[in-house]
From Swiss-Prot:
Belongs to the sulfotransferase 1 family. 3'-phosphoadenylyl sulfate binds at residues 65-70, 140, 148, 203, 237-242, 259-261. This is Sulfotransferase 6B1. The gene is Sult6b1. One of its GO terms (molecular function) is sulfotransferase activity. Transmembrane segments: none annotated. Its main location: cytoplasm. It catalyses: thyroxine + 3'-phosphoadenylyl sulfate = thyroxine sulfate + adenosine 3',5'-bisphosphate + H(+). GO terms for cellular component: cytosol. Expressed in brain, heart, kidney, thymus, lung, liver and testis. Coiled coil: none annotated. It is an enzyme of class 2 (transferase). The keyword Cell membrane does not apply. It is found in: Cytoplasm, Cytosol. It comes from Mus musculus (Mouse).
Length: 303
């Protein structure tokens, strides 16, 4: 993952900015999507268009709170198993976050580079597709995603909080949260589910069988690992192991990034009306699509 000190420094700086930021001041809008002003700038987005990807870059794409830090750890461990070199990115790994000069600095980083993003497919720099970088896309069911996002806002000190779960749910459904609508993100990425160099991973599948998931990721990236190596990485990458080490790897925010990781945690907060509204939105946006089928909505989201 990113160099520990760089990651922690960046997060600490973002949290410091958040202290004086209210919910009404939290967002900047770029090309119709809201982003957190504590992490993103218009200048960085404009500079991103000229980012030069490499063919051996690995891009990890996800909507917020769908497991991006988990996948980043897994891919870092896979690279270590192959190269015997600990992966350490000198920048905060989220591609669209940071200052506008970061992309010049990234030209000096050794390969392979691991990049993460919460952007829609069509908001990414064209060089990613031109140079055929590999893209891992991780999805999580929308109900657990919403609940995890709510707890992140309301549990982390200094981040603007919502008055209630009901208030957050209304904003989530409308797409008025950081990085916008879950469903717009899903619709956009669904168009590319069968693209070359793109692989979709389900958070719930990793929870059910981490060894199989890691093996699939390894094969997609073209790595040849033994079963023993896969087992070792799996042991180091369980949610409990990640949570136990979270303060060391991610600083004070670590325990909030790895809060529970449960499948079905949404049942503690969703009321019947909210269930119906989310079910209708899923049906309207994703029912019958390849991604909709992959999400196994009936298994994970119907009470």
């Amino acid at each position: 993952m990113a160099d520990k000190s760089k990651f922690i420094d960046y997060i600490d700086d973002a949290l410091e900015k958040s202290k004086e930021t209210t919910l009404s001041q939290l967002f900047l809008t770029y090309q119709g999507i809201p982003y957190p002003v504590t992490m993103c700038t218009q200048e960085t987005f404009r500079a991103l268009d000229a980012f030069e990807a490499r063919s051996d870059d690995v891009l990890l794409a996800s909507y917020p709170k769908c497991g991006s830090n988990w996948i980043l750890h897994i891919v870092s461990e896979l690279i270590f198993a192959v190269s015997k070199k600990k992966y350490a990115c000198p920048e905060f790994p989220v591609l669209e976050c940071g200052d506008a000069e970061k992309y010049q600095r990234m030209k000096l980083f050794p390969s392979p580079r691991i990049l993460t993003t919460h952007l829609h497919y069509d908001k990414l720099p064209q060089s990613i597709f031109k140079n055929k970088a590999k893209i891992l896309v991780i999805f999580r069911n929308p109900k657990d995603t919403a609940v995890s996002f709510f707890h992140f806002h309301n549990d982390v000190p200094d981040i603007p909080s919502y008055a209630s779960w009901d208030e957050f749910f209304r904003q989530f459904i409308k797409g008025q949260v950081s990085w916008g609508s879950y469903f717009d993100f899903a619709i956009n990425w669904n168009k590319h589910i069968d693209d070359e160099n793109v692989k979709f991973i389900l958070y719930e599948d990793l929870k059910e069988n981490l060894v199989v998931g890691i093996k699939q990721i390894s094969e997609f990236l073209g790595f040849s690992l033994t079963d023993e190596q896969i087992e070792t990485i799996s042991t180091q990458s369980t949610f409990l192991a990640m949570r136990a080490n979270s303060q060391e790897t991610h600083g004070a925010i670590g325990p909030f990034l790895f809060r529970k990781g449960e499948v079905g945690d949404w049942k503690r907060l969703f009321n019947e009306t909210q269930n119906q509204e989310m079910d209708e939105r899923f049906k309207e946006c994703l029912a019958g699509t390849s991604l909709g089928d992959k999400l196994k909505y009936e298994a994970y989201c119907l009470a």
